[in-house]
């Protein structure tokens, strides 16, 4: 039977600003990537999101990003590998405190936004991020774009890696995501998104913007929790994957 983990970026509210429907989305995912205060989130939101995920039995991962609240961590900022190591380790450590207080374990680490995309193509940054994860806990799973430099770096260092695919994003011919600045970067149609996920899981391919079949590996699929139709999207994805005989379950650290 085909199997997939469903993950979502959560805990991205901060201060007076509320982003996403975290409590509702948690009913439809198996892994939660919780913001650690740099691109979004704050200590109170981190604590509450950890507690919610733990209550619902959803696996928890750190979601470190660039220090860019105004740009939501989606703007590329030039950083050195040393800086990538430091900011990754710092944010994992911050979330870890709340997990320890709640009595639950961290499952994975998934970089956010621009940091994720930069690490996907930059060997130096990807190596630094993988090192930070490994030095914190070599038992953690490193999430990264399927076929990316980040996955390669994690594999080289001996980490368990999870190749990630996206339900609501279009792909380019080289297997990277279409930049959000492009008009067709996001998939708004639920049926098209579901069809893309089923293809990625069952056929290990995705159809690029130009109609080319691109090979990939799908261990976990990301759905975004900050969109206007995020909750409907989450419900539909889970329902249709089950109907397609795809088992939905969290990854194992073993």
Curated annotation (Swiss-Prot):
CDD domains: LamB_YcsF_like. Keywords: ATP-binding, Hydrolase, Nucleotide-binding. Its EC number is 3.5.2.9. Forms a complex composed of PxpA, PxpB and PxpC. Catalyzes the cleavage of 5-oxoproline to form L-glutamate coupled to the hydrolysis of ATP to ADP and inorganic phosphate. Belongs to the LamB/PxpA family. This is 5-oxoprolinase subunit A. It comes from Bacillus velezensis (strain DSM 23117 / BGSC 10A6 / LMG 26770 / FZB42) (Bacillus amyloliquefaciens subsp. plantarum). The lineage of its organism: Bacteria, Bacillati, Bacillota, Bacilli, Bacillales.
């Amino acid at each position: 039977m085909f199997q997939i983990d469903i993950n979502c970026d959560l805990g991205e509210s901060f201060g007076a600003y509320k982003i996403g429907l975290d409590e509702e989305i948690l009913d439809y995912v198996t892994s939660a990537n919780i913001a650690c205060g740099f691109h979004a989130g704050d200590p109170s939101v981190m604590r509450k999101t950890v507690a919610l995920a733990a209550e619902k039995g959803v696996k928890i991962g750190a979601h470190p990003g660039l220090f860019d609240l105004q740009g939501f961590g989606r703007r590329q900022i030039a950083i050195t590998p040393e800086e990538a190591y430091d900011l990754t380790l710092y944010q994992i450590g911050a979330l870890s405190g709340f997990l320890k207080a709640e009595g639950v374990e961290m499952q994975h680490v998934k970089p956010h936004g621009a940091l994720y995309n930069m690490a996907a193509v930059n060997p130096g940054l990807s190596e630094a991020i993988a090192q930070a994860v490994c030095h914190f806990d070599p038992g953690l799973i490193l999430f990264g774009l399927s076929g990316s430099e980040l996955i390669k770096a994690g594999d080289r260092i001996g980490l368990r890696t999870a190749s990630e695919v996206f339900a609501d994003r279009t792909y380019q011919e080289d297997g990277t995501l279409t930049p959000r600045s492009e008009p067709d970067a996001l998939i708004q149609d639920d049926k098209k998104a579901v069809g893309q996920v089923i293809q990625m899981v069952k056929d290990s391919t995705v159809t690029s913007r130009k109609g080319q079949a691109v090979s990939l590996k799908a261990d976990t699929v990301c759905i975004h929790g900050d969109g206007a139709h995020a909750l409907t999207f989450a419900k539909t994805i889970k329902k249709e994957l089950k109907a397609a005989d795809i088992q939905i379950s969290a990854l194992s650290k073993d």
